[in-house]
Amino acid sequence: DDIVVTIHTDNSVSVVDNGRGIPTGVKMDDKHEPKRSAAEIALTELHAGGKFNQNSYKVSGGLHGVGVSCVNGLSKWLRLTIRREGKVHFQEFKQGIPQERELAMRDGFAISPMKVIAVTEKRGTEVHFLPDGEIFSNIDFHYEILSKRLRELSFLNNGVRIRLRDERQNKEDNFAYSGGVKGFVEFINTGKKTLHQKIFYATGEKNSDQGSSIACEVAMQWNDGYSENVLCFTNNIPQRDGGSHLTGLRAAMTRVINKYIDDNEMAKKA
């Protein structure tokens, strides 16, 4: 429930959390020679982290397991530190290639476990990377863009605290908002004249035709402005152009409002 994102003076970025830590055990069913740790596989192979499991995919973004492996492949270097089960595991990559492998034998197979560099009572994962300047023409991180996105994530993941630090400018922001999407609407309407004090909020869950469960949250509050501000997210990922969920909401609201107008003969009064 605590995440720290730091932009360092060399324009590298580190992300530290206090979660369970990426699994570090060697995957004996790995086809690679030597057999690698689960963490190395997740950071070097596309689709290795795919979340084809309803519980895993309920909240988190991504699906096909390409995110962190792409970051690794597009970085000049990436350093992975995992604190798990009382040990500090470490592995370094350069342009996606593991460096200074640990090698051992197990059950007649060559294995490459993560290096253990210390003991600890803490837990969590730290990813520290520097974008590759030979691939990107601009590797400067914009504080405002990161700040806006991390604020969104703080609202969308109620109870999670996210801290953003910029060592280049000695700036820091703490995002620890409560209230979820309802609190997000309240934040967006700050300083605006709202037409109703209470924020409309609804949540529900329904099984799809494929048998998976889909949960939905909606929060709305009208203000006296002339333009609308509609934000849509699926598993924390913003949909700039909306989607079928927004289309369905608009259709349902139009139907309900028209019915209310007809039932109360408001159109005739107008």
What are these regions (language model features)?
Residues A42:
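Short basic (Lys/Arg) and small-residue
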Residues D2, T9-A38, G49-F187:
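GHKL-type ATPase core
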